[in-house]
């Protein structure tokens, strides 16, 4: 089965403290029924690390995963949230934005 959101997609956050932020999907985590995504610049937390051999330690900013239902793919033409559909073009199954009909990949 094809995924509606993939790594590298531009998405907008629909709910939560980062509502309205736009970012690129870094990673899709699909474990069991809980699908999550890591989006650049969204849900950033500070991680305190101790110094070890080879690294100095300190405070690092790290993006944490958010639920896939809290993001929507951006339409490539209008830059608005859109649902994703599938259609076959020249024997290839492709994703398209339902708002504008533009092919996403």
Curated annotation (Swiss-Prot):
One Pfam family this sequence matches: ribosomal_L24
InterPro entries given in the database record: KOW, Rib_uL2_dom2, Ribosomal_uL24, Ribosomal_uL24_CS, Ribosomal_uL24_KOW, Translation_prot_SH3-like_sf
GO terms of molecular function: rRNA binding; structural constituent of ribosome
CDD domains on file: KOW_RPL26
Presence of keyword rRNA-binding: yes
Keyword Membrane: no
One GO BP annotation of this record: translation
Keywords: Ribonucleoprotein, Ribosomal protein, RNA-binding, rRNA-binding
GO terms for cellular component: ribonucleoprotein complex; ribosome
Family to which the UniProt record says this protein belongs: Belongs to the universal ribosomal protein uL24 family.
Purpose: One of two assembly initiator proteins, it binds directly to the 5'-end of the 23S rRNA, where it nucleates assembly of the 50S subunit.
Subunit structure: Part of the 50S ribosomal subunit.
Name of this chain's protein: Large ribosomal subunit protein uL24
Record organism: Wolbachia sp. subsp. Drosophila simulans (strain wRi)
């Amino acid at each position: 089965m094809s995924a509606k959101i993939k790594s590298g997609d531009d998405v907008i956050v629909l709910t939560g403290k980062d509502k309205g932020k736009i970012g690129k999907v870094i990673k899709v985590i699909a474990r069991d029924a809980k699908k999550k995504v890591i989006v650049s610049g969204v849900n950033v937390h500070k991680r305190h690390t101790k110094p070890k051999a080879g690294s100095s330690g300190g405070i690092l900013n790290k993006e944490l995963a958010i639920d896939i239902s809290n993001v929507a793919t951006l339409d490539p033409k209008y830059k608005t949230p859109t649902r994703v559909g599938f259609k076959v073009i020249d024997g290839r199954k492709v994703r398209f934005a339902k708002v504008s009909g533009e092919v996403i990949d």
